[in-house]
């Protein structure tokens, strides 16, 4: 009997809410055993696992030990030294901190490098485009400098010699010189920045990797989506997520470990692969995230799992492996039936859809499960798909004022005295359809309140003055 109780207690059952640990990962300090985002000088992104004693390779930028960056705040920039060591610096392009520099041969900042040659020009009209001939330093010379050692000042030495060998550098404007210097620093300096891997940063990573995987969604659109959906701690939401779990991760961040998210999917198992970077405890994920397939959602009465409960005597007679299998099947049946009961109960605090499904055919089954005055938010990368859904909502009358929203953040290049947008940027972002769930009155509307009582008296027609004088005569 004791072994039966022990096997049953070892199952993955949902613990009590009060006994659950909240978010254990650090959002401010670089801590071990969690994921982080590396931002390279070339503006590339890399996700790393901060395992103590591990070694991270950044390709041409070098290799470093994980222990050297632990304990620093997120957002700290490092420079790779010899023997897998790193030192903290201010930024990708700024000079290293005096307290963290061990040698006196400090690198030059962009202002110091700009002053190496003569004064800059007021404009670029004196520059003659002769291609690569304007640079005396050849690619073979650069390769020799790279092979001379893996020290931290090799990149700075290459940049200095490239500026000294550039015949037209003094003919550039000061702003053009700084842009040239920044490009070379991004290419040759062995630096990187460690950032916290939140949902926004994870979306940036997938945008650089494959925009179709996140359905062309931008960061500002993700923020607008969560804002219109009114995602908050303690809520109960219905979600369709075809981005691999990025929307689910963003919702869990906002909900701070409190609430429930029912994720509807069309496969045997949901695709939440992005949650592996969230570093949330498994117990927290199991408690907050509930999955249900569309067959269970549309036909809940027929899809409930019927489980035959065995008696204690029958359980005692089972072998250890069969007993564990029995408890797993029992727990699975309870989990599925509890999610189906939750959907049948309805009254969700909001509905979010980020998918390629045809929503006009699916909304009639989803809208009844949404609570009154709750938001219905649908994202699509194509506006035409949302126009059809908006027309369907307008005729349904169970969703109030469906509106299509669009947001764009355009980066600008700032120059002293003038400012203009960056010439090249991605044309993605997507569109959001937002409405409010309402309950229309089935019968006619009855007016309430006092009326005016009396109709306005008509003013007598004014008789022309000439006609009145003739009548008096």
UniProtKB/Swiss-Prot annotation:
<feature type="region of interest" description="Disordered">
    <location>
        <begin position="445"/>
        <end position="473"/>
    </location>
</feature>
<dbReference type="InterPro" id="IPR017423">
    <property type="entry name" value="TRM6"/>
</dbReference>
<protein>
    <recommendedName>
        <fullName>tRNA (adenine(58)-N(1))-methyltransferase non-catalytic subunit TRM6</fullName>
    </recommendedName>
</protein>
<comment type="similarity">
    <text>Belongs to the TRM6/GCD10 family.</text>
</comment>
<feature type="region of interest" description="Disordered">
    <location>
        <begin position="1"/>
        <end position="25"/>
    </location>
</feature>
<keyword id="KW-0539">Nucleus</keyword>
<dbReference type="GO" id="GO:0030488">
    <property type="term" value="P:tRNA methylation"/>
</dbReference>
<keyword id="KW-0819">tRNA processing</keyword>
<comment type="function">
    <text>Substrate-binding subunit of tRNA (adenine-N(1)-)-methyltransferase, which catalyzes the formation of N(1)-methyladenine at position 58 (m1A58) in initiator methionyl-tRNA.</text>
</comment>
<comment type="subunit">
    <text>Heterotetramer; composed of two copies of TRM6 and two copies of TRM61.</text>
</comment>
<dbReference type="GO" id="GO:0003723">
    <property type="term" value="F:RNA binding"/>
</dbReference>
<dbReference type="GO" id="GO:0031515">
    <property type="term" value="C:tRNA (m1A) methyltransferase complex"/>
</dbReference>
<keyword id="KW-0694">RNA-binding</keyword>
<dbReference type="GO" id="GO:0005634">
    <property type="term" value="C:nucleus"/>
</dbReference>
<dbReference type="Pfam" id="PF04189">
    <property type="entry name" value="Gcd10p"/>
</dbReference>
